[in-house]
């Protein structure tokens, strides 16, 4: 079951008269799985429940912003989850690609070439995700 929770907007925005403030719907699910549904399948179901199908992706580029992780660290979503998002966007007619911006600090993501190397080292490649990596340098 996918649960829904209403979350309020930033109160500063609510003070502006010319802005219509609506509550955002936030969707979440348990990380527990069963024999009939694994985590990538749950992610796909969550995206569809949240309404990704109502977005017009037909022949449009779709930047999927993701943190590729620093080389040697594990604090990033794995490529198999990115592949699920890419698959759904492509099924809806979109031209998906993964992207992230470089860092200001010195490290493995300080420029586009090193950043792409970091992404590939952490498993983000066209073969594992189904789309290209483009660094917004």
Please report, for each region that a protein language model flagged, where it lies by residue.
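N-terminal and secondary-structure boundary signal
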Residues: 2-137
């Amino acid at each position: 079951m996918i649960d829904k929770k209403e979350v309020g907007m930033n109160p500063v925005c609510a003070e502006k008269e010319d802005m219509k403030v609506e509550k955002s719907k936030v969707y979440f699910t348990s990380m527990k799985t069963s024999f009939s549904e694994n985590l990538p399948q749950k992610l796909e179901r969550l995206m569809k429940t949240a309404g990704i199908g109502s977005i017009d992706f037909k022949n449009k580029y779709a930047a999927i912003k993701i943190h590729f992780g620093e080389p040697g660290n594990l604090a990033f979503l794995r490529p198999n989850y990115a592949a699920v998002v890419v698959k759904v966007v492509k099924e809806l007619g979109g031209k998906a690609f993964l992207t992230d911006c470089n860092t200001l600090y010195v490290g493995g993501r300080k420029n586009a070439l090193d950043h792409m190397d970091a992404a590939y080292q952490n498993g983000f490649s066209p073969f594992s995700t189904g789309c290209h990596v483009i660094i917004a340098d």
